[in-house]
C-alpha cells in the first residue's frame, strides 16, 4: 500500500503553529516544571496528533529553548520601550525598574521559566543568549550613563548586576507571596532605583 505523501508546510504555517505551541508550552512548563512536559503532552494540550509537534521541534530541549527565547524577547522589548525617548539616567533606571516589575506580574509564567527552571549550558542556544544579553543591556547602559554623569561611581557592569539581583530578589519574593513584613513591592523597588548609589 502506497503511503499518503505528507503535505509540505509553508513558512507561515510553521511559524503560526510554533507560536501557538510556544504559548501553550509556556503554561505547561510553568505548571509542571521541565520534567513534567513532553512533546506528547503538548500535543494533547493543543488537540493535535501525538506526533504533530515533532514536525516543528526536534525535541523537548529545542521547544524549551524557544519558549525561553520568546519570553526573553518580550522582556527585552518591554525594557527597550520603557526607556524610549528618556535621556535622564536616573529616570531611565526608574522606568526600567517599573517595567521589570510589570513584566513579572503580568507574565508570571514567562518570568518563572526565564529565571527559575533548568537552564541550558552556555553556548547551546545562541538566539536565546542574544535575547538574554539584550534584556540586560538596557539596565547596563542606564547604569553606565549614570556613572558617566557622575551620579554613580565604580564599575558599571558590577553595579548593574547588583541592581538586577536586588530587583529580581524582590520580585521573586513577591511572586512567592513572601513579602509580608510590612513593605510593599512597589515601595521596595522604588527605594532600589531612587537610590541606586546604595548598591555597592
Indicate where each model-derived feature is located:
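Helix-turn-helix
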Residues: 20, 24, 28-62, 66
Amino acid at each position: 500500500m502506497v503511503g499518503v505523501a505528507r503535505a509540505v508546510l509553508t513558512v507561515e504555517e510553521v511559524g503560526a503553529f510554533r507560536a501557538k505551541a510556544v504559548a501553550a508550552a509556556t503554561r505547561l512548563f510553568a505548571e509542571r516544571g521541565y520534567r513534567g512536559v513532553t512533546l506528547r503532552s503538548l500535543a494533547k494540550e493543543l488537540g493535535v496528533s501525538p506526533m504533530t509537534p515533532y514536525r516543528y521541534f526536534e525535541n523537548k530541549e529545542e521547544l524549551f529553548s524557544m519558549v525561553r527565547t520568546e519570553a526573553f524577547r518580550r522582556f527585552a522589548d518591554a525594557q527597550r520601550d520603557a526607556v524610549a525617548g528618556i535621556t535622564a539616567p536616573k529616570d531611565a533606571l526608574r522606568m526600567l525598574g517599573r517595567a521589570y516589575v510589570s513584566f513579572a506580574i503580568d507574565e508570571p509564567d514567562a518570568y518563572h521559566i526565564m529565571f527559575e527552571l533548568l537552564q541550558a549550558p552556555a553556548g547551546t542556544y545562541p538566539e536565546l543568549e542574544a535575547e538574554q544579553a539584550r534584556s540586560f543591556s538596557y539596565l547596563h547602559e542606564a547604569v553606565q550613563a549614570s556613572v558617566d554623569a557622575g551620579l554613580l561611581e565604580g564599575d558599571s557592569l558590577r553595579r548593574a548586576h547588583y541592581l538586577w539581583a536586588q530587583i529580581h530578589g524582590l520580585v521573586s519574593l513577591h511572586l512567592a507571596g513572601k513579602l509580608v513584613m510590612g513593605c510593599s513591592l512597589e515601595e521596595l523597588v522604588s527605594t532600589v532605583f531612587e537610590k541606586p548609589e546604595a548598591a555597592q
